[in-house]
């Protein structure tokens, strides 16, 4: 059967990435979902990250986001902090332990990206990213 439908190919690529990434991340006691949350926290923690921010960014349900954060908290990688601007709101932030691991985890992300796109030239990789962003309506971001 010829695979010529973009939705099927994108899903297969996602599953292949998760298979490769989970094998690599096992050494760090992280799942792909936990890694993605850590990556987001590294990038956005200065702006204050709430559970709802994770839900929106990754299109995940509230229970899923809560579960991932709770597991990261048990591993000592994230903590909740009070929001000084809103008494009923809390932020999620990387712990000192997580900040120490940041360079290694970010490098790991680059390695995973390279592994997934190793059959593409640099120009093809850029085109792929551009097309995926366009498909998702993220061209200007």
PLM features per residue range, with description:
Residues 51, 69-70:
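Short, hydrophobic-biased segments on the C-terminal half of alpha helices
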Residues 70-129:
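Charged, amphipathic alpha-helical coiled-coil/dimerization segments
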Residues 1-28, 75:
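N-terminal leader segment of winged-helix/HTH proteins
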Residues 1, 122-141:
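C-terminal regulatory/oligomerization modules of transcriptional regulators
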Residues 19-61:
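N-terminal helix-turn-helix DNA-binding core of bacterial DNA-binding proteins
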Residues 10-13, 17-20, 58, 101-117, ...:
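Alpha-helical linker/hinge and terminal dimerization helices associated
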């Amino acid at each position: 059967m010829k695979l010529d439908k973009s939705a099927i190919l994108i899903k297969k690529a996602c599953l292949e990435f998760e298979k490769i990434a989970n094998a690599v991340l096992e050494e760090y006691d992280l799942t792909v979902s936990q890694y993605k949350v850590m990556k987001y926290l590294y990038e956005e923690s200065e702006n204050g990250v709430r559970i709802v921010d994770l839900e929106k960014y990754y299109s995940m349900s509230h229970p899923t986001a809560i579960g991932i954060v709770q597991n990261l908290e048990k591993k000592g990688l994230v903590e909740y902090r009070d929001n000084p601007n809103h008494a009923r709101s809390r932020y999620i932030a990387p712990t000192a332990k997580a900040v120490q691991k940041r360079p290694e985890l970010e490098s790991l992300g680059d390695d995973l990206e390279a592994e997934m796109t190793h059959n593409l030239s640099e120009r093809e990789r850029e085109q792929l990213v551009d097309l995926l962003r366009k498909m998702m309506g993220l061209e200007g971001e």
